[in-house]
């Protein structure tokens, strides 16, 4: 099984506002960078989309170490999602899960991709080179959404 290290990040200028996502994928000596953006989005949507795009870029089942600075995404996929699904995509307080269509996409990728994923939280803006690069790519995504890239 291929070993892949992934760094993801999302950014938003205003919340909601124009946003971007960035991904760094590393496998051995190979490295690939991805980014994109949307107008009228939120930081959490961009954090989710970064992970979705990263996992969607993998062509075969991989052993993935995925670094992200979003506890919302990490806890959502590792702790909360099973409860949401049991409750018909509702939170513990009975409210509809926000960004449900993205959560469903991520759940499908995690469940059906054949990947073994180690979800690792990293403090954002704390000097981690992979996270800093993903952040720069996410900001490039904001510029792209605004037509400046």
UniProtKB/Swiss-Prot annotation:
Q: Does the keyword ATP-binding apply?
A: no
Gene3D superfamilies hit by this protein: Ribonuclease H-like superfamily/Ribonuclease H
Compartments, as annotated in UniProt: Cytoplasm
On whether Cell inner membrane is a keyword of this UniProt record, the answer is: no
Per its UniProt entry, what is the enzyme's top EC class, as one word?
hydrolase
Report the EC code(s) recorded for this entry: 3.1.26.4
What's its catalytic activity? Endonucleolytic cleavage to 5'-phosphomonoester
Q: Keyword annotations for this protein?
A: Cytoplasm, Endonuclease, Hydrolase, Magnesium, Metal-binding, Nuclease
- Domain named RNase H type-1 is located at 1-143
Report the cofactor remark.
Answer: Binds 1 Mg(2+) ion per subunit. May bind a second metal ion at a regulatory site, or after substrate binding.
An annotated GO cellular component of this protein is: cytoplasm
Cited Pfam families: RNase_H (PF00075)
A GO BP entry:
DNA replication, removal of RNA primer
Q: Its quaternary structure?
A: Monomer.
- NCBIfam families noted in UniProt: PRK00203.1
Describe the task this protein carries out: Endonuclease that specifically degrades the RNA of RNA-DNA hybrids.
Q: Which family does it belong to?
A: Belongs to the RNase H family.
- Could you tell me which PANTHER family the record lists for this protein? RIBONUCLEASE H1
Q: What is this protein called?
A: Ribonuclease H
- What organism is this sequence from? Paracidovorax citrulli (strain AAC00-1)
The organism's lineage is: Bacteria, Pseudomonadati, Pseudomonadota, Betaproteobacteria, Burkholderiales
